[in-house]
């Protein structure tokens, strides 16, 4: 098992970042996400928005990794649940893979909150738990996947900035 975590501060207010995060895919920074389907969306009695989405991703796995995993399939699916609580000014998003679960599990949690000292900024904390199951070189693959998650997190931050920038230019 490998645990990866990170914190990133956006130079934008929470509501701006959340609107962009909800429209994060597709984006040119991370073209491996090839589809997003909203399966459920509802608002509860406390005004929290609950969403369940299915993300379709195309991972260009290196030949060595495909050989170790014994899988030629590179199209994978991810289940993403999110809760946006406007009263608490918090968005929590949890995702897990639903493809290749017999080989690997990746559970990711993202939390967006206003910066505690500057309301014009937003803090994103991320954590991923990666477990490769029953494969030799499992710890190597877990480290490789953690590196990929780190790279994709940076692409995600850039995508949110890109969406905000393009939303603001469309308004002005």
From Swiss-Prot:
GO MF annotation terms: phosphatidic acid transfer activity
All residue ranges annotated as the PRELI/MSF1 domain in the record: 1-172
Keywords: Lipid transport, Mitochondrion, Transport
GO annotation, cellular component aspect: mitochondrial intermembrane space; mitochondrion
Subcellular localization: Mitochondrion
InterPro entries given in the database record: PRELI/MSF1_dom, Slowmo/Ups
Pfam families (alphabetical): PRELI (PF04707)
Residues marked Important for interaction with TRIAP1 (site): 36, 49
Physiological role: In vitro, the TRIAP1:PRELID3A complex mediates the transfer of phosphatidic acid (PA) between liposomes and probably functions as a PA transporter across the mitochondrion intermembrane space. Phosphatidic acid import is required for cardiolipin (CL) synthesis in the mitochondrial inner membrane.
Subunit structure: Interacts with TRIAP1.
Entry's family note: Belongs to the slowmo family.
Protein name: PRELI domain containing protein 3A
Organism whose genome encodes this protein: Mus musculus (Mouse)
């Amino acid at each position: 098992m490998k645990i990866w975590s990170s914190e990133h501060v956006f130079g934008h207010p929470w509501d701006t970042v959340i609107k962009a995060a909800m429209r994060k895919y597709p984006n040119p920074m991370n073209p491996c996400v090839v589809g997003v389907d909203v399966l459920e969306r509802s608002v509860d009695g406390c005004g929290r928005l609950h969403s369940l989405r299915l993300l379709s991703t195309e991972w260009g796995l290196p030949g060595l990794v495909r050989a170790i995993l014994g899988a030629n399939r590179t199209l994978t699916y991810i289940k993403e649940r999110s809760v946006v609580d406007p009263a608490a000014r918090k968005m929590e998003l949890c995702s897990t893979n639903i493809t290749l679960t017999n080989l690997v599990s990746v559970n990711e949690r993202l939390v967006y909150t206003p910066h505690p000292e500057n309301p014009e900024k937003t803090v994103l904390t991320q954590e991923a738990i990666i477990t490769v199951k029953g494969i030799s070189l499992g710890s190597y693959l877990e480290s490789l996947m953690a590196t990929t998650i780190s790279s994709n997190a940076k692409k995600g931050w850039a995508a949110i900035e890109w969406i905000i920038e393009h939303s603001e230019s469309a308004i002005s």
